Swiss-Prot record:
Keywords for this protein: ATP-binding, DNA damage, DNA repair, DNA-binding, Helicase, Hydrolase, Isomerase, Nucleotide-binding
Domain notes: Composed of 2 helicase domains, a winged-helix (WH) domain, and Lhr-specific domain 4.
Top enzyme category: isomerase
Domain of life of the native organism: Bacteria
Note: Part of a locus with an MPE ssDNA endonuclease, a putative exonuclease and DNA ligase, which suggests the locus may play a role in a DNA repair pathway. This proteome also encodes a full-length Lhr helicase (PP_1061, AC Q88NZ2) as well as this Lhr-Core only helicase.
Protein name (database record): ATP-dependent helicase Lhr-Core
Family: Belongs to the Lhr helicase family. Lhr-Core subfamily.
Binding note for cofactor: ssDNA-stimulated ATPase is most active with Mg(2+) or Ca(2+); Mn(2+), Co(2+), Ni(2+) and Zn(2+) stimulate at low concentrations only.
Length: 816
């Protein structure tokens, strides 16, 4: 075995590699016991920078009959990454014959492995934030982690901006309490605010190491054979099917990314119908497929035996697929960081080029494609910010820490305040959380199930009920979704193969005998019982495609700004790049019939139709912020003039349709102020209903609502009813309940993007209003008209109506 200081160099030399400067810097920092955040492009060698640093610093030696106890804790955001990471970490241990073991602990870990880990944790444990918290609830958790020397948080950018990251901050605070100064390293890519990312992970300070960012990245676009001058969203992009087939054919192995699981299912079916000879050579991958199916797809990708995989964000992160030569993105990626992340799935190794090809689903996405490439070259990457003062996560953490050995309030308070998320936690907030887990707050004191934590005679707070402890452990985590039904093949004797899971709301719309598309198969629904939908294969040609909530992502601010810059250039007759030259006829028509948005103007259009008077406004603020702006402006104008409006939005702008004419030239400038923004936004929307929806998630995280045991899961309707009851009880009898306030704050920050709304209003008020009266809707307005009709027409009627409108508008455009 080489000397410890030569371990890394020896292993690199064995593979014909030379360490990069950033890798050497990390090695030296870990040897000094320092912490840090390593930021480098995908596939640049971050994993081995930190892993080989650990081997050099901690000098593995034989420990008698046993392999070394736990030395390194490796936290990953996805269970799918754990096995892949384990293989990557095991390789140098095997080749250098080092006496360390590597183990995985996640929701997929079998009972035999869990039992082994209960006796002794492996030298290196790869786990998720949820499983780490579960390990910390054990009575001997401190003893289990007594030999821990290093924590590594992989893909930190994926955890930073959500409650899973907050949960991890609290877990790390517990480990740091046991091991003051515990070295911690975060690994990150595609992030625009590195200082904040480092400060959240390392509140005591640490290094910021910038890795190689010069990885070759090629971004190109498949240009449609014909440019539609009247585009509309909602296409699956299947007009590009032949061209996508040609691109897949030209590469040994490709990933085809879609933004939704339903779109992935549709594209998989379409590709197989277009190329039956690809059966067995292409595959489908998304989070709702059965684990063994996803494992098979990932193994086959690694082995290079698949021509293409149609996938969603389930393959966004760090799984290492060396054979993948290129990535195709169907539709807009909606953000620069997401596009970079997906591009990095190809050429996933130092020195190799990554290539992503954008496949527009409608003509305006050509402008987005040009904007995305320009923003990538300029390095404009989205920032992510940690949530603050998540009281539901704190309540869950208090109960978790009361399990096992329990906690003393003063010591745990110091721990909690050492995290970035709770550094400003007030004494009153802490006392409320403590009272809530002990007594259920001021409104649940009569119910024993909500008196989860008890103060013992020795001053230690513990959970004494085994039943409540078991329920709590099953609910640990912050990932909340609608109840899912297992999808299984029907077998009279039971025990049919599991295909995956679908949302209860989708299955509720089907009756036995109806057909659906799932996992690339056409299936017939047989029956539904005990949260399981039983199906059999079907030969039907048409079927409903399984749908999941959460499919529409808003356009990021960075991509939206880059998009407006491209339109500004077009307004000044500059059409750079193949995408902008291709879409020039559409933009020329927009300029002829109206005007193009620019960086110095705010385009607004008015139009009279049989439906009424239309206002189209284009802030380019993303779907959610545009929805907030539309409601805000309609409400503010209605105070001066009684107004009944219907609203349609997309990422570029919104439509207000009213039965009466409105003097927008005088009303709009007044409606764009930021004064009283919070009050006006809350008044303009059904904020109570939105807060109730958000409270359902908060109630589950805080442990108020139990989702049921594995064999007896509660339905979405049951969970909604329970959380709705709590919401009303708190609203009427416990108005100071901090979970209610949190629900409102989350609606404002996450659903209405109040900060973005504020910034957008400031920006809009500084722009010159360009109000155009239209004789007929132009390309930008047409996209919004279709969004409005989508709410009132069936799919077939909508398609017919759009076809007639396009024919009429094309005739007018051709007539000049």
């Amino acid at each position: 075995m080489p000397a410890a200081t030569d371990l890394a160099n020896a292993w690199f030399a064995k593979r014909g590699w030379k360490p990069f400067a950033f890798q050497r810097r990390v090695w030296a920092a870990v040897e000094r016991g320092e912490s840090g955040l390593l930021h480098a492009s995908t596939g640049a060698g971050k994993t081995y920078a930190v892993w080989l640093a650990a081997l050099r610093a901690f000098k593995p030696r034989p420990q008698g009959r046993h392999l070394a106890p736990i030395q390194v804790l490796w936290v990953t955001p996805m269970r799918a990454l754990a096995a892949d990471t384990a293989r990557a970490l095991q390789a140098p241990l095997d080749e250098l014959q080092l006496p360390w073991s590597v183990g995985v602990r996640s929701g997929d870990t079998n009972s035999a492995e869990r039992a082994r880990q209960a006796r002794r944790l492996p030298s290196v444990l790869i786990t998720t934030p949820e499983s780490l918290t579960l390990l910390l609830t054990r009575a001997k958790a401190r003893e289990d982690f007594a030999t821990l020397q290093l924590v590594v948080v992989d893909e930190w950018h994926e955890l930073l901006g959500n409650k899973r990251g907050v949960q991890l901050q609290l877990a790390l605070a517990r480990l740091r309490h046991w091991h003051p100064g515990l070295p911690t390293w975060g690994l990150s890519a595609t992030l625009g605010n590195l200082q904040h990312a480092r400060d959240v992970l390392l509140p005591q300070g640490g290094l910021l190491v910038q890795g190689r960012q010069d990885k070759a990245l090629q971004v190109d676009t498949l240009l449609p054979k014909a440019i539609e001058r009247f585009p509309w969203a909602g296409h699956m992009g299947l007009k590009m099917l032949d061209q996508v087939c040609h691109e897949i054919d030209a590469s040994a192995s490709s990933l085809v990314f879609t933004n939704t699981r339903a779109q992935a299912e549709i594209w998989y079916q379409a590709l197989l119908e277009a190329r039956p000879d690809w059966a067995g050579l292409i595959a489908l991958h998304h989070a709702s497929l059965a684990r063994d199916t996803r494992d098979w797809v990932e193994r086959s990708l690694k082995q290079g035996s698949l021509k293409a995989v149609i996938c969603t964000s389930s393959l966004d992160l760090g799984v290492d697929f060396l054979p993948v030569e290129r990535v195709l993105q169907i539709g807009s990626a909606k953000g620069i960081a997401r596009l970079m992340q997906r591009a990095g799935r190809s050429g996933h190794a130092p020195g190799r080029r990554s290539r992503v090809t954008l496949v527009p689903t409608h003509s305006l996405e050509l402008v987005e494609a040009a904007a995305a490439r320009q923003a990538l070259l300029a390095g404009h990457i989205e920032a992510r910010f940690s949530p603050r003062l998540c009281m539901d996560v704190l309540v869950q953490h208090l109960v978790s820490m009361a399990l096992g050995s329990g906690f003393r309030p003063e010591q745990l308070l110091a721990e909690v305040r050492s995290t970035w998320a709770f550094r400003q936690l007030r004494d009153s907030q802490w006392q409320w959380a403590l009272d809530f887990v002990c007594h259920g707050g001021s409104s649940l004191t009569a119910y024993p199930d909500y008196q989860r934590v008890e103060r013992q005679a020795d001053g230690v707070y513990r959970v004494t009920s085994e039943r409540l402890a078991r329920r709590h452990r099953m609910g640990i985590g912050t990932i909340v979704s609608d109840a899912n039904l297992q999808l299984k093949y029907w077998s009279k004797g039971g025990g049919g193969k599991t295909l995956g899971s679908v949302e209860e709301a989708f299955i509720a719309r089907l009756r036995p005998g109806d057909t659906l598309v799932f996992a690339g198969r056409v299936l017939e629904l047989v029956r539904v019982e005990n949260m399981t939908a039983y199906v059999r294969r079907s030969t039907a040609r048409k079927a409903a495609v399984a749908r999941w909530n959460g499919g529409r992502m808003p356009l990021s601010s960075e991509l939206a700004d880059a998009l407006v810059e491209q339109l500004d250039a077009a307004a000044h007759e500059r059409f750079e790049g193949p995408e902008m030259r291709a879409v020039r006829p559409l933009l020329a028509l927009q300029a002829q019939w109206s005007a193009l948005p620019t960086t110095s103007t705010l385009l607004a259009e008015t139009f009279k139709s049989r439906q009424g008077w239309h206002l189209f406004l284009y802030p380019f603020a993303g779907r959610m912020a545009n929805l907030g702006l539309a409601n805000l402006i309609a409400w503010r104008v209605s105070r001066a003039q009684p107004l009944s409006v219907s609203i349609a939005v997309n990422d570029y702008g919104f439509e207000l349709l009213s039965p009466a004419q409105v003097d927008w030239a005088s009303h709009l400038p007044q409606a764009l102020g930021t004064a009283d923004l919070l009050e006006d936004v809350l008044a303009s929307l059904n904020a109570g209903e939105m807060a109730l929806r958000r409270f359902r998630e908060i109630a589950q995280i805080a442990g108020l609502v139990f989702g049921g045991y594995p064999a007896a899961q509660k339905s979405t309707r049951q969970i909604q009813a329970s959380s709705g009851l709590f919401y009303e009880v708190f609203r009427k009898h416990d108005a100071g309940n901090l979970l209610l306030g949190q629900a409102r704050d989350e609606v404002l920050s996450e659903e209405l993007e109040i900060e973005r709304l504020h910034r957008q209003l400031l920006k809009m008020s500084e722009l010159q209003l360009d109000l155009q009266a239209l004789r007929r809707p132009g390309p930008l307005a047409f996209a919004l008209l279709v969004e409005g009709m989508r709410e009132t027409l069936s799919t077939e009627k909508l398609a017919d109506r759009i076809a007639r409108m396009v024919a009429e508008l094309e005739q007018a455009a051709n007539a000049g």
